[in-house]
Amino acid sequence: MKKIYLYIVLTLVFCNFGFADSLRVVDGDTIVLNGEKIRFSGIDTPELKQTCMNGDEKVFCGKTAKMLLIKKIGNETPECISEGKDAYKRTLAECFVNGESLSSYLVRSGYAFAYRKYSKKFIKDEEFAKENKLGMWSMKFQYPWDFRKAS
């Protein structure tokens, strides 16, 4: 009887691993969830190698955006609503943790920008961060799209 019980428990444990969500944060606006590369729609974050200047101090604002996202997600699994694919075949989506938009959170924190070229959805969040000098709005920075053009 103990062997049967042990077999059932082990089977349930190993079956659950097959359904476990795999998550990797690539940068501030891109994750890989269960093998699918997801780009947060409507926002743009600094590139990982991009820096900002906080007075005389160089800050890796792209890495800071990534770390902020990792911290916000914690041990949760984001729920993403797909909005199609981009030119690089990534899924464009808005993702949520505990009902809160990760995109809105990043923009309101000042470590992402409303990507007006593609969406107007996060402009109020950006205005809030800018008015309150949050995140990059308290530093000298280059917009991510300008940084990519210059690189």
Annotate the PLM regions.
Residues 2-151:
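Small beta-barrel nucleic-acid-binding modules, primarily SNase/OB-fold domains
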